[in-house]
Design a protein with these regions (language model features):
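Arg/Gly-rich low-complexity intrinsically disordered repeat tracts
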Residues: 7-17
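Long, acidic, intrinsically disordered low-complexity segments
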Residues: 19-42, 131, 138-139
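Structural motif
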Residues: 40-49, 67-76
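Amphipathic alpha-helical interaction segments
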Residues: 44, 60-63, 83-84, 88-96, ...
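Short, hydrophobic/amphipathic alpha-helical patches that form generic packing surfaces
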Residues: 50-62, 76-87
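Amphipathic protein-protein interaction modules
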Residues: 68-118
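Helix-rich interaction surfaces within compact, conserved domain-sized segments
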Residues: 108-138
Length: 139
């Protein structure tokens, strides 16, 4: 079991795009994700996208430790981005290294315009990721 009470690993299923949701529905779901992470961390303030990515990276790594280094935090966020973008086939999971860290390979070029579009895409995928965690918890 991990920090979110979910068994690791999750199965990969194809991600439905945000365009199937109204903007207000997406904003509500993103707020739910932020509250889930805030509660898991026992913080008072809502986390930003970077903290959400960090927590997804830890979830995918499968273990928690106190005092992550700056480099480890960057690696965890990279793991999260790879995991989220694997829903659309941009990355493919290739396995774990000798220390148990997941590794991915880029399978296709990501064509996004600007930081805003990148952040929106990651938020959409994070919403989907947490919906999958919920579904796994309930099954």
């Amino acid at each position: 079991m991990d920090n979110f009470g979910i068994n690791y690993p999750l199965s990969t299923i194809h991600y439905p795009l945000k365009r199937n949701m109204e903007d207000w529905e997406f904003e509500f779901e993103w707020l739910r994700v932020r509250h889930t992470v805030k509660d898991a961390l026992k913080h008072d303030a809502l986390p930003d996208l970077n903290v959400v990515l960090l927590m997804i990276g830890i979830q995918e790594l499968g273990f928690w430790k106190k005092g992550w280094t700056k480099e480890e935090k960057q690696d965890l966020m990279h793991i999260a981005v790879c995991r989220l973008l694997s829903y659309d086939g941009y990355y493919e999971f290739v396995g774990l290294d000798t220390e148990g860290w997941p590794h991915y390979t880029l399978t296709q070029k990501i064509m996004l315009k600007g930081q805003g579009e990148q952040e929106q895409m990651l938020k959409e995928k994070a919403v989907y990721y947490f919906k999958q965690l919920e579904a796994e918890r309930e099954s």
